[in-house]
Amino acid sequence: MKTKVLFLSAILASVTLNSVAHSAVFNLATEKQNIELNQSPKKIAVYDLSILDTLNALNIQAQIVPKATFTGSLTKYNQAQFIKAGSLFEPDLAQLKQLKPDLIFVGGRSAKTLESLQPIAATVDLSAKTDHYMSDLKNRTLTLAKAFKRENMAAKKLKDLDQLQLKVKEQTANKSAVMLFAVGDNYMPHAANDRFGFIHELTGFKSVLPLTEKTDTARPEAGSAEALAAEKKNVELLKSAVQQNPDYVIVLDRGAVNTQKYASKQGIKTHAVLGQSQAVKQNRVIFVNADAWYITGAGLDNTAFMLKEIA
């Protein structure tokens, strides 16, 4: 009888230990990857600011980040206590080997480095898909929340974001806009399916441009016949947008990244095409924060910030 009791006790102890061990396992599953660790990661490296922004929003702190200018809710990462290893495009492999992170995140600009990082530590690609902006943001947020046990916090943040978006869409109902990406004196209109065209899904502004026909053609070399043809097409597209008389012109000024110096605020007024638009003449122009829209992008807190710029 005593032997049987001891045997049962041993089984129960084994089950308990296995349960504890299993509950300690960290699991992060995406469509393409399934990351499993024996414990929750203590040293995290992040090479995409939209991911860093979402982690930060969920009170999950990275220890290793790229050399970059951190703004907004990410300003603290400028501090020396956070190790800088590589850039947003190229993580420093040698430095990471010495630092031995438990988990590495890549996405967007750094996504191509996934395979080179995997021998160093578990690495996951959480690149944003802005062609379905909000659903993708929610999926990536919930993926992180589940892995790091932040479900309640994520649910509240996402609910607040939904309410904010609804408020913005109430204000933009039946209003149109053209999204412009400005590089110097060159203003490039972005249709709803272009890189920054997600603003239409995000804010509810109707686009005045037709959807762009997508190609795999590389950007033409400056000064080439192809580049001149593309420039001419761009001017025609601008003229077409102005003729549609958009209620608002929205400008993302590349030159203001890391400087917050918006030369386009003056340049747009004297632009041969845009200067003739009613939106510009009547000061219905929104210059969005260049760091937020161009560098940080589709993060949880940053998306709320971007919506508030339009509200």
Q: Which residues does each predicted region cover?
A:
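A short, acidic, amphipathic alpha-helical segment used as a generic capping/interface helix at domain edges
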Residues: K232-V242, T270-A272
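Bacterial Sec-exported substrate-binding components of ABC uptake systems
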Residues: T3-V5, I11-L12, T16-S50, N152-G184, ...
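Structured C-terminal subdomain patch of bacterial secreted/periplasmic proteins
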Residues: S135-D136, Q244, Y248-A311
